Amino acid sequence: MKKDLVIFGAGGLGREILFQMQVNKKFLEEYHILGFVDDTPDLLDKNVNGFKVIGNSNWLEQYPAVINTVICLGNAQHRKMVAERLSKNKNIVFTTFIADDVRIPEEVAFGKGCIFCFSCIITVNISIGEFAVFNSDCTVGHDSRIGNYVTLYPSVNISGNVNIGDCSEIGVGTNVIQCRNIGNEVIIGAGSVVITDIPSKCTAVGIPAKPIKFH
């Protein structure tokens, strides 16, 4: 019997993940997609890409049976808030989704609720926290450590022995050279090249990437 599953977030990432689920035969053999859950009032009961928005977070918090959930929110802080809130309902199982063409060794350790989109390559001896999102065409090199709630936007390349702290977001097309540390709650602007360590709670942009503001 298939497991019921909802996609939290009917925005861009949620719709992309729906598509990637629909073309993943192995995933569909295990899961039955019920629809979307979204906190946007205007979307409730509407159809989004062929699936209904069946409820909001309040509805899901009170769901009375086991239900698998993939949180599809690109913003790391929003994803963390939703995950912490939904964790109160022990019926919710936070599911990891791995697209069918992702390359990831069995020994790579990753936490619950992660997303690995089309064409990602995760190499060896890597540790990944909970609820991390790897958008399409990202690569992560050997011995890297990716924290909880990290977002890698499309085409990010992480070299070996890189550490990325919790709730950091790495912008589209960013490259990070080997043995660099990126702190917690960091935003790296699109197209940046990280060649030095980046401190926590800042926005860094450019080639090379440098902090432009702290938050």
Residue ranges of each PLM-predicted region?
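Short active-site oxyanion
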Residues: 4-5, 32-34, 66-70, 184
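Conserved Rossmann-like nucleotide-cofactor binding loop
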Residues: 13, 42, 210
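Short helix-capping segments at alpha-helix termini
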Residues: 25-30, 88-92
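Glycine-rich adenosine-cofactor-binding loop
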Residues: 2-21
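Phosphate-bearing ligand-interacting subdomains
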Residues: 41-103
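Structural signal for interior beta-strand "rungs" in well-ordered beta-sheet cores
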Residues: 96-205, 209-212
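NAD(P)-binding Rossmann-fold cofactor-contacting core
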Residues: 26-46
